Amino acid sequence: MTRIFVLLLASLLPAAAADTLDIYWIDVEGGAATLIVTPGGDTVLMDAGWPGFENRDANRIRHVLTQEVEKDKIDYFITSHFHRDHSGGLNQLAAIVEIDTFVDHGDSVEQDRPRGKALWNDYLEVAEGKRLTIEPGDALPLTGASLTFVAARSKGLSEPLGSGPRNPHCEGAQLKEEDMTENGKSVGFVVKMGEFEFLNLGDLTWSFEHELACPVNLIGEVDLYQTTHHGLLSSGAPQLVKAVRPTVAVMNNGPRKGGSPDVWKGLRQVDGFVDLWQGHRNVQATDAESVDRKMIANFGETEDCQGHWIAAKVSKDGRFTLVNSRNGFAKTYSSK
C-alpha cells in the first residue's frame, strides 16, 4: 500500500508551473547531491555532499538552486544514508538554504562509531522536529510528477511498481555478502512523469539490489538511472541493471572515486542502453575505459575542479535532454 504524506504548506498559492521536470547532478567531488524540480515547482534534494572544504559543496548546491532553477528553498531533503559524502554537507547547507522537511530511513545504524555518532548528532541538530521517516512504497505529495520510495533500511518494495515480471537475469546471478553498514540502508526512489521514469538508489549495495530484482523485477523498466554507489563494484548488480533497462545513466563519481571501467562495461551490455554521462573523468582510466569527453562534466583532480553539473530536462511528451554545463553539449532521448 502506498502512503502519500500530506504536509502543511507555507503558502496557499502554488508556484507557477514549469514545462519540464528538471534533475541536476551537482558535482560534490565523489559525494552525492541530486536536485529534482517538478513542473509544479517542488524541490527535492537527495544528499548534500561532504562537510568542510570552505563550504564548497553547500555553495555549489545553493548556486544551482538559486541561479539555475531560481528557487529559494528545498521542500524535501532526502538523506540516502548517513555517510560523510552524502549527509556530511547538510549542516553547512541548512545554514544558507531553508529546508522544510528532512526525509530519512530511520536512525543511523553507525552511531557506535565516533564518526557515525558525530554525523548523526549533526543531523538531529538541523532535522529534529522536521523528520519524515519513510518505508518502501511511500510517496511524496509532489505536483506534476510522482516520487515513490522503492528501498529504505535494507527493505525493498513488498509489491512491484508495475506488472512484476519474472526476471530472466536472475538465473546464475552473482551474489555478494549482505552489507550491514549505512550503505545497505540507502533510500532509493523512482520519479515518474508521464512515460518517463528515473531511478536513484543512493549507495544501495549488491545484495539488496538483488532483492529488488529477483526473482521478480519489482521496479520495472526506467529511462534514466543514477548509477548506484558512484559506479563502484560493490553495487550495480547486473541482474538489476539489466532488468530495469535504462536508456541513459549518469554517474556521480569523483576523479579517484567510483567510475569503475567494469561498471561502464556492464552498462554497455544492457539491452537498449545508449549513453553514460559522468560527473568526472576517472583519472586512472584509459581512453578506452572512458566515455565520450563531451559527456564528462569535469576533468583532472579535485583541487582545480570547477564543479560543473549535469542536468536532465524532461518534457511532458516523454523526451528528455541531458546537458553538460562544462561545454553546453546536449543530447535528447525518448522515453520507452
Predicted regions and their residues:
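Conserved beta-strand hairpin/beta-sheet module of binuclear metal-dependent hydrolase folds
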Residues: 18-73, 182-206
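Short, flexible loop segments at the rims of nucleotide/cofactor-binding pockets, characterized by
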Residues: 22-24, 52-55, 79-80, 175-179, ...
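Extracytoplasmic/secreted envelope proteins and their assembly/folding machinery
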Residues: 33, 58-62, 87-91, 117-121, ...
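Long, structured stretches of catalytic cores involved in phosphate-ester chemistry, encompassing
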Residues: 108-109, 113-114, 213-300
